[in-house]
Amino acid sequence: MAEKVNVCIVGSGNWGSAIAKIVGANASALPEFEERVTMFVYEEMIDGKKLTEIINETHENVKYLKGHKLPTNVVAVPDLVEAAKNADILIFVVPHQFIPNFCKQLLGKIKPNAIAISLIKGFDKAEGGGIDLISHIITRHLKIPCAVLMGANLANEVAEGNFCETTIGCTDKKYGKVLRDLFQANHFRVVVVEDADAVEVCGALKNIVACGAGFVDGLKLGDNTKAAVIRLGLMEMIRFVDVFYPGSKLSTFFESCGVADLITTCYGGRNRRVSEAFVTSGKTIEELEKEMLNGQKLQGPPTAEEVNYMLKNKGLEDKFPLFTAIHKICTNQLKPKDLIDCIRNHPEHM
């Protein structure tokens, strides 16, 4: 890497802006980093003014993180290649569906020895069905290593400076330290593990379980039932990783990316909220998305669909009754009230 490490944040939504507060402060304070951090901002007009200009003049992302000042060394750039061309570390934090297109734009335009880290929770659809990990897509397209950062990190709470933990999954030890230095803060504690695939898979699977937790809330079944759904969800997450990404360590599931993120998503988070409304309102998931999420997309139902495709292919649906039932409820093959019958005789109880 260059003498001073250049950093670019690809994305400037709610989570991207929250992480920019930490990364910007660290780049400014630590001698190994170049102070100026570029942040790719999709250009849009806010009250007749460009969003990048507003951010660079007021140091606030008024659209996605209102009321929080960004460090003055974080510079909004509307051109993706311009933002990324000098970076030694590329932080990807955009909705996962943009990744293939962004990678095409960046191919051959970035430093060949750069590294990436993905903060993106969710999968892409693999060709022919099933799931493709975002970090794998980035590595495949850009021919650079890609670590992941996942944890119980609701963006607004991170921006507020409330204490939390996060997990970095990085298969190559030599990058672990520089990544930890970049993200670690007094209120944002980082644990680095080598089990990158398990860290990333946890970040996507927990959204399925959160839908189940939301159904339980909508049915008003109480805390004991919700705890059972969360526990069985964790067991199915562990089993899924065991089947499709063998070689992972059990201890990874007890890091922030696993059990902690699962809990926070099943009590807060949009997948839970919309799933509860799905039960109480009688509206479709699509209608509720439009009404409740201000243009954001739910990750739980599409992830459940891809996971179900993989389980079906291996004849494993009956070994994952919670994942299977949640998928069937999201696609109207089952009623929400059928959820409990589906998990009453879970393989865990046999």
From Swiss-Prot:
It is found in: Cytoplasm. SUPFAM superfamilies: 6-phosphogluconate dehydrogenase C-terminal domain-like (SSF48179), NAD(P)-binding Rossmann-fold domains (SSF51735). The active site is at residue 206. This is Glycerol-3-phosphate dehydrogenase [NAD(+)], cytoplasmic. One of its GO terms (molecular function) is NAD binding. It is an enzyme of class 1 (oxidoreductase). It comes from Drosophila ezoana (Fruit fly). It catalyses: sn-glycerol 3-phosphate + NAD(+) = dihydroxyacetone phosphate + NADH + H(+). InterPro entries: 6-PGluconate_DH-like_C_sf, 6PGD_dom2, G3P_DH_NAD-dep, G3P_DH_NAD-dep_C, G3P_DH_NAD-dep_euk, G3P_DH_NAD-dep_N, NAD(P)-bd_dom_sf. Homodimer.
